[in-house]
Amino acid sequence: MRLGALTGLDVAGKVTGFALDHRKVAPGCVFGAFRGRRFNGEDYIDAAVAAGAIAVVTREGVAVPGALALPADEPRRRFALLAGKFFAPFPGTCVAVTGTNGKTSTVELTRQLWRMAGHSAASIGTLGVTTASETVTTGLTTPDVVTFLANMHGLAREGVGHVCRH
C-alpha cells in the first residue's frame, strides 16, 4: 500500500508492514513508538529508522530523523487505525468476549456452533488461533494490535467469515 494512500498525506513510499518492536522492523514498515511501563518505544526510533522504517507513529513533539513522523495525541489509536487500513479486509462477523471466567470456553463453543451452522469460523485467544483445520499456538492470551490484525487478515484471506475472540 502506498504511504500517501494510507495516511492521506502527499508523501511517497510503499508501506510493507507494521511493527511495535524495533527488532521486527523491515524496510517499509510503520513503527509504533509508544511509552510503556517497562520500555519507551521512543528510545528505539533511531534503530527502527536504521532498519528501514518509512514512518513512525508517536506522540506530538517527538523527533523522527530520517522517516516520516506521524504524531498524534493518541498515538496508539492512530497506529491501530492505520494498521487496520493496511491489513483490511477482515472477516465479516467478529465477536469479542469479555469477563472474568469462561472466556476461552465461550469463544471455542461459539466457533464450534458457527461451524455446525455451516459457517467458516475461527477463534482467537488463550488456545491460539483455531480454525476447522488447525490450531496455531501463539503463546499470547491477547495478541498485540499488529499480530491481531495480521491474523484477522489472514483468516479473511483463507475464507473465514466468522471470528470470536477474547
Language-model-derived ranges and their functions:
Residues 79-166:
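Phosphate-binding loop of NTP-binding sites
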Residues 1-85:
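N-terminal leader/targeting and accessory segments in enzymes
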